Amino acid sequence: MRLPLVLALSLAACGGLPDPREEKPTAPADNDPGYTVTNIGEWYVTSDAAQTQDELMTIFVAVPPATEFVDVWIADLPVQRLSKQPDGRFAIQTSIADVPPGTWDVLLAADGSTTAFARIPFNRSAPYYVLVTTDWDFADPGNQANLYQEQLHQNHAELRITHFAAPYTFTDPAVTPARRQELAAWLIAQRDMHGDEIGLHIHPYCNFVTSAGLTCVIDQSTVLNIDDTGYTIKLGAYGREDMRTLLEHAKELFVANGLGTPRTFRAGGWTATLDTVAALADAGFIADTSALNWARIEEWEGEELYRWNMENWAPINDTSQPYYPSQQNVLTDDAPTLSILEVPDNGVMIDYVSLAEMNSLFDANFDGQPLPTPRTLMMGFHPAIQFSESEYLRVDGFLKYADMHLASKRKGPVVYITLENVVAAFAP
């Protein structure tokens, strides 16, 4: 935020004050209580291609009578002189864009003293991107789940949700045309009012698969021997070309219903293979988040869903970070790579973690120290008729924890962002 400051007077007008000393003063053993320094934040986050931060530092100093001038040394930037304000304080507002990540000091000295009257530390950090997502497992999530999401936006003003919406909303015969349009209008409102994203989620329901002109697979379920609805079928059961067909059909359905063209994706049950991700790249998608921190869905241990994810996403864990998958192996970034960013679902879904676990995942990726490079925490939940108040409260509780570290409040490096927007921070 830019504050109105009086510009520095010329040396002549100031009665020939000496130039600022380049050499930093000695830090004081304790800050001098005769000076009151305000407005310096605890955290300043770097800008990048995904987002722009206010990289200005504002300093006000109330000084003892007869103080002639105040100089400041910010990190390793050149010394600068503060301007005297009409109320007698001294102030400066200056860019710290050239200060790299780390913990730094602001040193302030008066009247050319070689000992500073104040040393104030601050943190300069790359952003900690927190991504909140929803997976539409069902054609109609119900009104209560949507109301809960509206409440989350009300409680957390900076929240951005990536809604992985469902193409089967528009092919399930149980959903009336009027209800389809009601759900589409709700998604559009979230995007337009809150800056949310409308991405794509696919469980290969037969009503959707057959509407795309394909034969529905029913014998590769993560839960059942046969699933003639298609819901629990591994998405990887559809090869690269068939997956491309499903994606193009989904895009057509979204565009026809006013949702725009989705650019990001998560597979139902996280069951994406290399062919799945390659098909996404073929279809122009820019990011996928099917790579699962599988150890956190231990509720499914002993079942095919757990086994499949453990085998296919073996190295993905609490602290896995974005990468461009190899054309030969979806788990590595060996060249040549696909033109799609994989952002691991390292925070899993709220269905499978307690609030304490969710907060510990936040801490695993941010230990309170400045980040040298951007990091991501991906989490989400399933909006559905079954979505409970306790699940809502876990999401809300986690967001309260994340809000304590917001970059905009100078309290930490947290920036809420959608999946499509975070891609720019991880350009290949």
Give the positions of each predicted feature.
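Active-site-adjacent pocket scaffolds in enzyme catalytic domains
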Residues: 267-375
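Aromatic sugar-binding surface patches on proteins
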Residues: 85-93
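Acidic (Asp/Glu)-rich catalytic clusters
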Residues: 147-158, 176-201, 206-208, 212-223, ...
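Surface-exposed, short loops/turns at beta-strand junctions within beta-sandwich domains
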Residues: 96-103
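C-terminal domain-boundary segment and adjacent tail
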Residues: 287, 356-428
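Short, compositionally biased P/S/T/A/G/V-rich stretches that sit at domain boundaries
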Residues: 20-57
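Active-site beta->alpha N-cap acidic-glycine motif
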Residues: 117-197, 261-263
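CE4/NodB-like, metal-dependent polysaccharide N-deacetylase domain
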Residues: 153-154, 158-161, 228-273, 372-380
